[in-house]
């Protein structure tokens, strides 16, 4: 059971998210960051 190599992952790489490297999470903000300099278009929804 411990020698399970599926999906081409190395044995030492866990598949659950809690043990991913910190760099993996830290980089997400830069990808999502808006660098266009424009203000966001605010769409009014019901009840606002």
Curated annotation (Swiss-Prot):
Keywords, alphabetical: Sporulation
Gene Ontology terms: cellular component: endospore-forming forespore
Induction details: Expressed only in the forespore compartment of sporulating cells. Expression is sigma F and sigma G-dependent.
Top-level taxon of origin: Bacteria
Predominant place of localization: other
Biased composition (Polar residues): 1-12
Protein name: Small, acid-soluble spore protein N
